[in-house]
């Protein structure tokens, strides 16, 4: 009954909140309610700007005093003062000072602020003014309030016994009262002393000093906090602090308290220099009191460094380095620098030199993986890559390329060998084409030399010290495009694009590269090779394995084709690709039957995209294993996009257990097929309400994998968001048949309107959350 009740309640809320006015832009609506400066802004020295005065009556007292009565208007540059009576006085002879005095009510306007109050003193030879008992509104942006005294200066405003809010008139959702307030105009921030924060007129907290942004400029200070409750974290509260160290250097520190785990400190530092930009991130928990994942209390931490630079015209430096304390880190802590479903994090750096015909790269690479294995992947340190390209040589008939690499492999395990690998790969391509099609004839040579060294462990396997491998390759690639304007669908043009490829590469036993006996605790072949994901596009790849340690023999024909449909505006609306490899001879790297291609043909592979209309898109992929006589892979996604970020996405993913197991190494098995059905939705229900929901169900386990519901209310001056999430997790010594969940509830509250650009609805941020974040997977738009 509870499930039905919540469903009906949710539908009721959706129906009640939905409005066609959601198409309007909230930011534009909010800015309609603020004053805007009329006319062109006048620049210049106030001493040199003329003063224009209009009034019903005027009384002159020599040349130092004048009194104007009745609908008095005083204009000077951008300033405009209106009142029932205004007096103009001039003081002094040399460097005389002129003042305008308004009493018993006035209105003042310039390009930055509008005020009305009781008394005003306007300095006509500068931008200064002194005002009593005023109501004010900022011009062109949200911000208003009251003050007993206001001092207007060229670069700042000082207000005594003042209030401030970004809410529009007739709304007092929140406000700040301060004994003294100083608004810095160019720096776009306000300082407040003895400040009281109120919600609907009710005092919430007091602080002796407060800084608040009133623009887009970066300022040091407290940012919006976040809070919530979780099964694993307990009650938690995160308070970010922003430090604007320099124009090109800033930092954000976020202490986070979790009642079940303790204090976590998160720090992010960004920098921008002449030779590059990047950031450092540290997440650190000294002692994790909640030890389900580790079975012991210990520190948990993350370090990230990302850097990109372009210097000395042709040089590039790139760093992408992430390291966590343990393999369960991303399962326990949500971070934008990794996800438990990725299975690994990168740790690599490279420096590269680019020229039109060649490039050189020196890099260091390794991965931190989260699989339950005792032996991790190899690190490549150093790795030197050189590429050379020269097209249209031999009178424009041939394209030449050369890839070469030198790399040293090392492993943390004493059981694993180390090695140097030297590789050179020249290729010649003969491109032939005419209006009927194109034929590319490519010849290539793989020449590799290994210098290997046995592992230092007592039980390390003996290994061949020197291995040489030379493999020639020839590939013929033919394709054509056949167009038919008389498609069976009226108004559409159909193309048929058949593709034929022949690939030949002789067999060479490569079992001496790396360990001869495959270690079940090591995921990979050789030093950096593993099976690549198979799909339609992989049918036309040269190699089945990543890296260079396993290059399979090939004597095969690949047949494939794509059909496309174009509308009358030449926009592609639908495509379908299908193909298969036919093996003329066994494809293998050694004599192990497990490392051979199964059967005389590969799986049938299909890929398709369909842009149904401007709002609906569909994508699907399918593989049928002719050896197992069953579906091995299937994916499909249907998405509805109405406007803005509004979307509904339905997805289904299937991976056959036999397909998984035949791609795993040694005695590792997955144990079941993957059958997963998912739904993601994000919707601006009205101008103010936003909803994001996500649900993934494992059909094999008959249990949900992840559930998420987030709803946010946005107004012109504040927003509040609530997110509820339930997802599958794990712990140390967990039984294979045991499914554990973490339940969490989060709350965010923000003050809006302080910056002209802070009216976003946070849909993108909510879609990124979770183990299975939203991915837009369409190629037709």
UniProtKB/Swiss-Prot annotation:
One of its GO terms (cellular component) is cell outer membrane. Keywords: Cell outer membrane, Membrane, Signal. Residues 1-24 form the signal peptide. Pfam families: LptD, LptD_N. It is found in: Cell outer membrane. Coiled coil: none annotated. Disulfide bonds: none annotated. The keyword Cell membrane does not apply. GO terms for biological process: Gram-negative-bacterium-type cell outer membrane assembly; lipopolysaccharide transport. Gene3D superfamilies: Lipopolysaccharide (LPS) transport protein A like domain. Its main location: membrane. Belongs to the LptD family. Together with LptE, is involved in the assembly of lipopolysaccharide (LPS) at the surface of the outer membrane. Component of the lipopolysaccharide transport and assembly complex. Interacts with LptE and LptA. This is LPS-assembly protein LptD. It comes from Histophilus somni (strain 129Pt). The lineage of its organism: Bacteria, Pseudomonadati, Pseudomonadota, Gammaproteobacteria, Pasteurellales. The gene is lptD.
């Amino acid at each position: 009954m509870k499930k039905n009740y919540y469903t009906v309640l949710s539908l009721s809320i959706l129906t009640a909140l939905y409005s066609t006015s959601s198409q309007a832009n909230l930011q534009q609506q909010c800015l309609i309610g603020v004053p805007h400066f009329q006319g062109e802004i006048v620049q210049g020295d106030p001493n040199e700007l003329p003063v224009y005065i209009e009034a019903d009556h005027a009384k002159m007292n020599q040349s130092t005093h004048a009194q104007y009565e009745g609908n008095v208007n005083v204009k000077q540059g951008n300033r405009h003062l209106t009142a029932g009576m205004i007096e103009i006085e001039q003081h002094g002879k040399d460097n005389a000072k002129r003042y305008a005095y308004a009493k018993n009510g006035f209105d003042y306007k310039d390009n930055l602020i509008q005020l009305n109050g009781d008394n005003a003193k306007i300095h006509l030879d500068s931008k200064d003014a002194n005002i009593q008992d005023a109501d004010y509104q900022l011009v062109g942006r949200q911000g208003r309030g009251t003050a007993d005294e206001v001092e207007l200066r060229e670069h700042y405003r000082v207000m005594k016994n003042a209030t401030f809010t970004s809410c529009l008139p007739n709304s007092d959702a929140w406000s700040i009262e301060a004994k003294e307030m100083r608004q810095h105009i160019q720096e776009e921030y306000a300082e407040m002393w003895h400040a009281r924060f109120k919600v609907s007129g009710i005092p919430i907290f007091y602080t002796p000093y407060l800084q608040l942004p009133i623009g887009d400029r970066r300022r040091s200070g407290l940012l919006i906090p976040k809070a919530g409750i979780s099964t694993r974290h307990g009650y938690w509260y995160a308070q970010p602090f922003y430090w604007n160290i320099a124009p090109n250097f800033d930092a954000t520190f976020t202490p986070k308290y979790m009642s079940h785990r303790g204090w976590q400190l998160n720090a992010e530092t960004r920098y921008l220099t002449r030779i590059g930009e990047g950031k450092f991130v540290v997440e650190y928990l000294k002692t994790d009191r909640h030890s389900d994942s580790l079975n012991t209390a210990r520190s948990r931490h993350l370090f990230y460094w990302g850097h990109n630079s372009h210097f000395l015209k042709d040089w590039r430096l790139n760093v992408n380095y992430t390291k966590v304390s343990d393999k369960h880190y991303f399962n326990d802590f949500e971070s934008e620098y990794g996800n438990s479903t990725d299975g690994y994090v990168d740790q690599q750096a490279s420096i590269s030199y680019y020229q039109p015909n060649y490039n050189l790269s020196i890099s260091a690479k390794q991965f931190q993986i989260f699989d339950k294995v005792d032996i991790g992947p190899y690190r490549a340190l150093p790795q030197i890559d050189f590429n050379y390209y020269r097209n249209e040589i031999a009178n424009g008939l041939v394209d030449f390329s050369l890839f070469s690499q030198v790399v040293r492999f090392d492993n943390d395990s004493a059981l694993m060998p180390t090695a140097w690998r030297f590789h050179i790969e020249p290729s010649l391509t003969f491109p032939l084409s005419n209006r009927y099609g194109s034929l590319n004839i490519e010849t290539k040579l793989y020449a590799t030399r290994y210098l290997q060294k046995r592992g230092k462990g007592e039980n390390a396997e003996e290994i061949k010290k020197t291995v040489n491998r030379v493999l020639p390759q020839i590939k013929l690639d033919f394709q054509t495009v056949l167009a038919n304007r008389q498609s069976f669908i009226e108004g559409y043009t159909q193309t048929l694009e058949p593709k034929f490829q022949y690939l030949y590469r002789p067999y060479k036993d490569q079992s001496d590269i790396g360990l001869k006996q495959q270690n079940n605790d090591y995921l990979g072949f050789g030093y950096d090779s593993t099976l690549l994901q198979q799909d339609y596009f992989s049918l036309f790849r040269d190699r089945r394995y990543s890296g260079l340690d396993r290059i399979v023999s090939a004597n095969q024909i690949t047949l494939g084709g794509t059909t496309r449909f174009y509308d009358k505006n030449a926009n592609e609306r639908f495509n379908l690709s299908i193909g298969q490899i036919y093996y003329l001879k066994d494809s293998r790297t050694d004599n192990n039957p497990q490392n051979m291609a199964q059967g005389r043909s590969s799986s049938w592979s299909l890929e398709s995209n369909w842009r149904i209309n401007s709002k609906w898109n569909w994508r699907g992929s399918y593989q049928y294993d002719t050896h197992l006589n069953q579906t091995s892979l299937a994916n499909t996604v249907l998405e509805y996009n109405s406007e803005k970020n509004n979307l509904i996405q339905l997805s289904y993913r299937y991976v056959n257990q036999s397909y998984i197991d035949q791609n795993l190494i040694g005695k590792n098995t997955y144990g079941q097929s993957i059958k997963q059905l998912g739904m993601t939705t994000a919707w601006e229900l009205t101008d103010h309400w936003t909803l994001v929901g996500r649900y993934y169900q494992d059909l094999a386990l008959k249990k949900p994998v992840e559930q998420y519901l987030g709803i946010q209310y946005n107004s012109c001056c504040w927003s509040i968001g609530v997110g509820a999430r339930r997802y599958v997790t794990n712990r140390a010594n967990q039984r294979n048949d045991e499914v554990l969940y973490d339940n969490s509830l989060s709350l965010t509250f923000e003050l809006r309107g302080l910056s002209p650009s802070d009216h976003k609805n946070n849909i993108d941020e909510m879609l990124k959350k979770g183990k299975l974040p939203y991915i837009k997977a369409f190629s037709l738009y």
